[in-house]
Curated annotation (Swiss-Prot):
NCBIfam families: PRK07757.1. CDD domains: NAT_SF. Pfam families: Acetyltransf_7 (PF13508). GO terms for molecular function: L-glutamate N-acetyltransferase activity. GO terms for cellular component: cytoplasm. Coiled coil: none annotated. Its EC number is 2.3.1.-. Belongs to the acetyltransferase family. This is Uncharacterized N-acetyltransferase CT2212. One of its GO terms (biological process) is L-arginine biosynthetic process. InterPro entries: Acyl_CoA_acyltransferase (IPR016181), GNAT_dom (IPR000182), NH2A_AcTrfase (IPR010167). Residues 6-155 form the N-acetyltransferase domain.
Amino acid sequence: MPAADTCVRNARLADASAISRITEGYAGEGIMLKRSVENIIEHIRDFFVADYKGQVIGCCAIAFYTVKLAEIRSLAVLEEFRNKGIGRLLVEKAEAVLSEEGVNEVFVLTLNSGFFKRMGYKEIEKEYFPQKIWRDCTNCPKRMACDEIAMVKTL
């Protein structure tokens, strides 16, 4: 079982290409916005990776909005490792780090609300997060017809 042999760790610069490849598949499906390798390198300290026997098979990132509010973003797992608990491991690691930092509320924008609901997230209106809208959504090509669901969890 891959989850049992998978370690979730802080991303390293050497992981940037793997993160790009993993997220590119999701971007191609319209599930997330494309991030360049340069952007990933610039934000590498925000990323965690799932490492399975030396191979990066998944990733997620965190973004702070206030000292008490953060977002989990860029959650992606290689197709052959999906539905094996890898996404859960990544989210749990991100939540643990955020909790250690004193964050008490974490949100996501997702097309997979069922996954996050099972992780204890509740649906909420996007307008609850004006910081996110002003930072990221204004430049999003889907901003006028956003199909993502905002969800929040208290840590």
